[in-house]
């Protein structure tokens, strides 16, 4: 029997039927339990007033995560003049760049303000909540990490993220991979080391430490230099709080931040949204799970051949 076996097909069908039944009753089955973060987690305080736009952090991230070489070198400052779409949208992260620096020119400022963007590693991640296969994990260190072996490519996380950070790799339609900053978890964070971008910064724009301590440092800076900072720490409370937090010398809305977010975690809004589309929820997971199984079997066959003993045994059972 070629393609997906009947056993796998029936399994997918049963999963789809179960999802349909559950989705018509409640949305709780598709949401992870409420997660309030870890009190002793690590974080990063970003002081935008110190950034000079050198892009060293972009280069360090590229090396640490073994990402493709960029089309323009990291020394090329012309990227700051690039905009996308008719609304003048700045550069954003994608599957080839987990962090980007953009330049802003807020009113009343003598010099530009540079802002580094990456996943903010929410205390209560909406990407985790929206993922029905639990491909996301919030670690005790504070990182929100992703398991590509579990992901089925539904892209719910991209819709749910309030910061629009998860990026999708479109290189293969049947091999779903979401790309984003992982806080250098595998190579640095879990070993107690700061992320590569923090380590490389020549201006000490970023401070790595326990989140609670960083909040104290931030408010001390604001109190000591009220003329230098806006009296707000972005990320302390927004959407339930984030591991990456920001100080700014100009209004946050003028340097690319969404200031319309409230302090309620997106997790509750995700549940409300999922509750409005039960039939979509019923079809979407089963559809993408089926695609994922087809793709992985195809790759396995290409690697081992259709006569591989495992395939023959599976077909006998089906």
Language model: regions and residue ranges:
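Iron-sulfur cluster-binding cysteine motifs and their immediate structural context
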Residues: 29-34, 56-75, 98-102, 124-152, ...
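N-terminal secretory signal peptides and thylakoid transit peptides that target proteins
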Residues: 1-17
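Sec-dependent signal peptide hydrophobic core
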Residues: 13-18, 278, 282
């Amino acid at each position: 029997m070629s393609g997906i076996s009947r056993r796998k097909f029936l399994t997918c069908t049963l999963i789809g039927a179960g999802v349909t039944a559950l989705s018509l009753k409640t949305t709780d089955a598709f949401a992870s339990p409420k997660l309030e973060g870890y009190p002793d987690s690590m974080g990063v305080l970003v002081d935008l007033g110190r950034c000079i736009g050198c892009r060293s952090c972009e280069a360090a991230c590229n090396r640490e995560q073994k990402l493709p070489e960029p089309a323009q070198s990291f020394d090329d400052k012309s990227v700051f003049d690039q905009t996308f779409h008719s609304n003048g949208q700045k550069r954003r992260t994608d599957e080839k760049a987990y962090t980007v620096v953009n330049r802003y020119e807020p009113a009343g400022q003598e010099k530009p303000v540079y802002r580094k963007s990456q996943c903010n590693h929410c205390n209560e991640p909406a990407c985790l909540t929206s993922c029905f296969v639990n491909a996301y994990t919030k670690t005790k260190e504070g990182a929100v990490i992703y398991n590509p072996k579990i992901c089925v490519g539904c892209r719910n996380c991209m819709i749910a993220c309030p910061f629009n950070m998860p990026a999708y790799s479109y290189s293969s339609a049947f091999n779903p991979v979401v790309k984003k900053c992982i806080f250098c978890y595998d190579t640095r964070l879990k070993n107690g080391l700061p992320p590569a971008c923090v380590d490389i910064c020549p201006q000490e724009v970023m401070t790595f430490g326990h989140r609670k301590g960083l909040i104290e440092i931030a408010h001390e800076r604001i109190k000591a230099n009220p003329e230098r900072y806006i009296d707000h720490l972005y990320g302390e409370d927004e959407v339930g709080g984030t591991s990456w937090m920001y100080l700014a010398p100009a209004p946050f809305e003028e340097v690319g931040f969404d200031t319309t977010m409230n302090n309620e975690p997106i997790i509750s809004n995700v549940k409300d949204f999922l509750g409005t589309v039960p039939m979509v929820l019923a079809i979407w997971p089963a559809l993408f799970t089926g695609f994922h199984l087809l793709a992985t079997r195809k790759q396995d066959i290409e690697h081992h051949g259709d006569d591989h003993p495992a395939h023959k045994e599976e077909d006998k059972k089906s």
